[in-house]
Amino acid sequence: MKIENVEYKVIEDKRVVVASIRGISFDAINVFNNRFLAHATSHLDLVSAWDDQKFMMPYSMKAVARCIPDDEFSVEKGKQIALKKLSEKYNRSLDRHLMHIANAMKKCLDNMDVYFTKHKMI
């Protein structure tokens, strides 16, 4: 997640800070393509290989930091808390979607192994 893409909304009368990020639908696919496929292949692209929604992250996410009545409201502290919550939420989603991709790749490789074995190519 790029921190510079995070937007904040401060609602002082409710003592709330909301951190949000948009345009992250392809982040898991991009991480997979750039981190793993770029080293193994020249131009294999996951998006063109599979059109599956389970690989797509949500378009946007948000996290809310609420100040309890006993504490003093601080916009900066609220931003830190909201960003931490958003980062954790984003990373859980990224990990889950990368696992979907890894499982699909494993199935594909298993199918290739069966094919190669059947045709005595191995």
Question: What are the residue ranges of the model-derived segments?
Answer:
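Catalytic phosphate/metal-binding cores of nucleic-acid and nucleotide-processing enzymes, i.e., regions
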Residues: 1-122
